[in-house]
């Protein structure tokens, strides 16, 4: 659209009509998901993972790329590199780090995630949200808990009981 010409490409996807329902669920989720109890990267990842999991439940016919406002190619990149991204978070000891720069690198809207590696420009922004979503999905698949229990559980409980193990 001509009004969006000055916006960066990574933001333009949010202006698509297909994003209307996911945006409504995002707004709703802020009212039902308690904010993280700490400022660690893992807590923020899980918080947004819960939001995206709500989209799984409330918008089951939408594809993952629409739910997270990625392109199909970005979803494929996430799937293909999930193990690599996870190893990076673990090896760099970022999960329990509360450095205020981490959300800007891995959670906040951006053209790409900032690992400080050659893959940066290939990676989608907000990769931490996507990984958090996979952790929440694993938790729900491997535990008999209600949605209410999920929403009230803290990040450590979810992570510790998720049995999350990405493919290498």
Identify the role of each PLM range.
Residues 1-75, 155:
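Acidic/His-rich structured neighborhood in mature extracellular/periplasmic domains
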Residues 52-168:
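A cross-kingdom marker for long, charged
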